[in-house]
Amino acid sequence: MKEAIARSGADPALMNYVVVGNCVPTESRSPYVSRVASIQAGLPMSSVALTINRLCGSALQAVVSSSQNILLGDSDYGIGGGVEVMSRGGYLSQAMRNGARMGDTKLIDMMVAVLTDPFGVGHMGITAENLATKHNLSREDQDAFALESQNRAAKAIAEGQFKDQIVPITISTRKGDVTFDTDEHPRATTMEALAKMKPAFKKDGSVTAGNASGINDAASFLVLAEAGVAAKNGQKPLARVAGYAVAGVPNEVMGEGPIPATKIALERAGLKLDQIDVIESNEAFAAQALSVTKVLGFDPAKVNVNGGAIALGHPVGATGAIIATKCIHELHRTGKRYGLATMCIGGGQGIAVVFERL
């Protein structure tokens, strides 16, 4: 957040509304994450902050919510994004507060809970299996998609495409300082290696760890402003929010959420699909992403050109801002005009945002 503010060139004192997406509780300050992050990023005590949970769509919703705050006149500047530390996801004891009178008790893995359908379908991987069946997607289709995601991400990293998007973080260890400046999740693989992986969620299924997104940690933020105020203060925006939408779908095929959300967002933006130059479609699972591409008729050459979540990871509450950042940077790299960021949401929703490069 601090780096996003610095890059914007705006005065932190003017950042008066922060919206942060977060899903998995990790510590005692988790309920305060938006407020703590904003104050530690240098915002004044007079600023306000809001933590939201729209599951996988949380950070993209935070961008939308910040835009809405500006449109409503609640703020001139806003910050939208998200954070997720899945590696530290907490365990919940429902019995400890009032005492377990006798017998065994259990702990609930709140990280896995976020990845589990709330209506009894099971792990989100089962919803991907449902889509593979519905849209006739073979194991080979999914593995080929996963391999392409890995290859595109590896190429983008080698070419330094993410250098301007990632803020290096240095931590001290017993062996000295370690700097993280490159995504850890991508890994070289082959169709043969992917074919050897066992189904992860269903006996004789086709969804594996190799063609699904990972368990990851990240934070990502965008600074938003009212156009007139930004111009008056000498800031040149990278893009504008041209349209957005959230839509509901049956929970057992929650991965189809981007389909209606994208249609509505494009309509609100006054655009047709063929006018979209860059598409960031979150890869929760290969079966899910392939289904969205198939139904909407996306041109695969425009989708996740620098790799997607299967390769780069899916830190649930942060991913939306990450793909928005990727989308906007790719628009500037290529000189294209319109971009789309869209993703499915557990429980049966989808979100989509259209950006125009400025």
Name what the model sees in each region.
Residues 71, 77-130:
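Flexible glycine-/small-residue-enriched beta->alpha junction loops
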Residues 1-23, 27-37, 41, 56, ...:
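Conserved active-site "lid/cap" helical segment
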Residues 9, 141-232, 295, 300-302:
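N-terminal extracellular/periplasmic Venus flytrap/periplasmic-binding protein-like
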Residues 52-84, 132-161, 222-228, 315-336, ...:
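Active-site-proximal alpha-helical scaffold in enzymes
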Residues 18, 22-77, 118-124, 188-214, ...:
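Conserved catalytic cysteine-centered active-site region
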Residues 20, 127-129, 162-165, 242-311:
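Active-site pocket-lining segment
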Residues 191-192, 196-256, 260, 264, ...:
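Condensing-enzyme catalytic core mediating Claisen C-C bond formation in acyl metabolism
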